[in-house]
Amino acid sequence: MLHLTPLIFLSLAMAAAVGVWGVFTWNGGFDEMDGIVASHQSTGILGLQHCPDLDRGLMSMVAFNLPVVGRNPIFPAGRRFMVQFLANVAVIPVILNTEGARAEPGSLVRYSTTWGLFSQMATSAVMCPLYGFWFVRQSGAKQTEGGTLRPLPPNKWVVPSSVLIGYGIPALLSFDPFQWGLDLQIRGILAFTLYPLCISLTARLMRKVSKKRGRSLSPEWNSTISYVAVGVVGMVSHLWYLGTGLTGYPLSGDAVSSVAGPTEVGRAAQLVLLFLQIDYVITFAAMLLLAWHELTRHQLVRSWRAAGTLAVGWLFLGPGATLAAAWALREQWLSRPRGVRGEIKQKPK
């Protein structure tokens, strides 16, 4: 079945284009977003007033998430879903940046920032299947040519640290946890929308500082810790979401009315929530398929056992924790000593 994996990835990408964007457009989602932007046309960021088109475009990006992350949303199910959504998705930038650091020059996998920005523009449901397609194609070509995976560069702590700062902090601020007000929340959402750039800039700064000080962690540093950490975050959020209930509360008409009217925001929130739910399912279907491919290709777990474990893990631990566990197993395997031919020594399963 491994040879069918690229075709499945392409099918998932097409399903995302139809199921995510097609449904949203059919239900009038863009009209709802225009209504929110019309009520709050500026991000309030100094300097952007001189570029009204750019300011309005950025506000359009903010308006997409604002109805479901507002401090007092009229659709509480949206806020709860977004909390666990962002917590589970945190493992994906760790994978993108780790594999980007490991990839050969010229490999499409190497451009982790580009993949991240593409995810924010086209949704992760479109990006992840395409990423999986190229990952499988290039890893298959490397295996055919007898090549080996490059080791991770020194200072492996840069990836988890940059993801924590560039992804985690903007994601937290987008929910306005300190009740700083709508204007600052809009900037937090905008920072999260551009999180791939935040991660990239943070990583570059950390590497420069580390290089100047001449400090680096030893090669024996266990890089699986990153996956364990984001896996625990994803599992806790998944269990919390299940514990708080999967159904939303009745609509209340006294929230985020400063952005738009209750009716408009209520309908917009429901459309965005449906959009995100479809996006969530396809995103992790693609990433867990990639995890299955890697576990099976390297013969770490039997094909049927890997599929069953990943499916059960999604249900009980959450997709983020399951994906993190699978990638941690792969990372642990890759860190084992290599033989004369470059093959990693392991006992057959």
UniProtKB/Swiss-Prot annotation:
Keyword Ion transport: no
Residues carrying sugar: N222
Membrane topology term: Multi-pass membrane protein
UniProt pathway annotation: Antifungal biosynthesis
EC number(s) from the headed UniProt entry: 5.4.99.-
Entry keywords, A to Z: Glycoprotein, Isomerase, Membrane, Transmembrane, Transmembrane helix
Domain of life: Eukaryota
Transmembrane regions listed in the UniProt entry: 4-24, 81-101, 116-136, 158-178, 181-201, 228-248, 271-291, 309-329
Annotated GO MF terms: isomerase activity
Keyword Ribonucleoprotein: no
Subcellular location: Membrane
Principal localisation: membrane
GO CC annotations, alphabetized: membrane
Family to which this protein belongs: Belongs to the membrane-bound ascI terpene cyclase family.
Purpose of the protein: Cyclase; part of the gene cluster that mediates the biosynthesis of the tetrahydropyranyl antifungal agent restricticin that acts as an inhibitor of CYP51 and blocks the ergosterol biosynthesis. The highly reducing polyketide synthase rstn3, the short chain dehydrogenase rstn4, the cyclase rstn5, the FAD-dependent monooxygenase rstn6 and the enoylreductase rstn7 are required to generate the first stable intermediate desmethylrestrictinol.
Protein name as catalogued: Terpene cyclase rstn5
Species in which this protein is naturally found: Aspergillus nomiae NRRL (strain ATCC 15546 / NRRL 13137 / CBS 260.88 / M93)
